[in-house]
A protein has these predicted regions:
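Fe-S ferredoxin-like electron-transfer domains
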Residues: 2-177, 181-185, 194
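Catalytic alpha/large subunits of respiratory electron-transfer oxidoreductases
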Residues: 48, 96, 103, 108, ...
Length: 269
């Protein structure tokens, strides 16, 4: 609710209201809460009650806002709108058109970040849906970011779909190992030790808010059953397990035994 001067307070859309001198903003007035409840009622009118099986449950903006505002009933007596539940957008993303709230974040992402428009809002009115041009599959190496951007469970990763509940994931800040850029990421591990997903972590100096799909899905080798869990140091013709410290000491000894190094090669450079 915005009040300026002697004019009565009015409810304004925050993202379209410019600040001005003498403006008083009250986000907790009864009028503000009532307006938010009305907006939520409109969004929930056709939104399916999929929370128990939705991958976004636990990190869903719409779910959080509904709990905050206490809106648990609706006045509409009409049936819910139905649309395609499992619409494949290519190798990475699945679209649930019933859950979509038409915020158009995904549309704007492709237009503004990779600069290649691929999604659009097609049809009109209550039949509006997100779709690709001519129903073509999405392309490019940044598709996974739209699953992070989606405020509901409309856009989900095929690789993470039905794999874990988010409240069972232990989250740890890390750095993507896939290339020399070193994007800041969040590693999410299921209780028990299996890595379930990598997600971008905000770092304006490196990757901003995004990460490429190559890095996003670069964790299969971490869960590989034949993955090396310890350093190996050669002793004669055999390799013996050693601690990380002993392994680094062996590498240091090999480097010290030769002339000064001109460069160090790495598959990640």
């Amino acid at each position: 609710e915005v009040q300026q001067g002697q004019t009565p307070g009015r409810v304004m859309v925050a993202c379209r209201t410019y600040p001005a001198e003498g403006m008083v903003v009250n986000t907790e007035s009864e009028k503000s809460h009532a307006t938010r409840r009305e907006c939520l009622e409109f969004l929930l009118k056709n939104h399916p009650l999929d929370c128990p099986i939705c991958d976004k449950a636990g990190e869903c903006d719409l779910q959080d806002y509904t709990y905050q505002e206490g809106q648990s009933t609706g006045r509409s007596k009409e049936g819910r709108r139905h649309a395609e539940k499992r619409h494949s957008l290519g190798d990475v993303i699945v679209l649930d058109q019933e859950r979509c709230v038409l915020c158009s974040r995904c549309v704007r992402f492709f237009e503004e970040v990779p600069k290649k428009a691929q999604l659009t809002v097609s049809n009109l009115g209550s039949r509006s849906v997100i779709s690709t041009f001519a129903d073509r599959p999405l392309t490019g190496n940044y598709q996974g970011n739209i699953a992070d951007l989606c405020p509901v469970g409309a856009l989900t990763l095929k690789k993470f779909r039905f794999q874990a509940r988010v409240w069972n994931l232990v989250k740890q800040a890390s750095t993507c190992p896939e290339c020399s850029r070193g994007c800041s990421i969040q590693v999410e591990v299921l209780r028990g030790g299996e890595v379930k997903r990598f997600r971008p972590r905000e770092n304006k100096a490196v990757n901003g808010w995004w990460m490429c799909d190559t890095g996003r899905f670069a964790f299969d080798h971490v869960n590989a059953p034949n993955r090396l869990a310890n350093a190996l140091v050669r002793s004669g013709h055999a390799l013996a397990e050693a601690s990380i410290e002993d392994g680094l000491a062996a590498v240091r000894a090999l480097l010290d035994a030769h002339a000064d190094a001109l460069f160090v090669a790495s598959p990640f450079c």
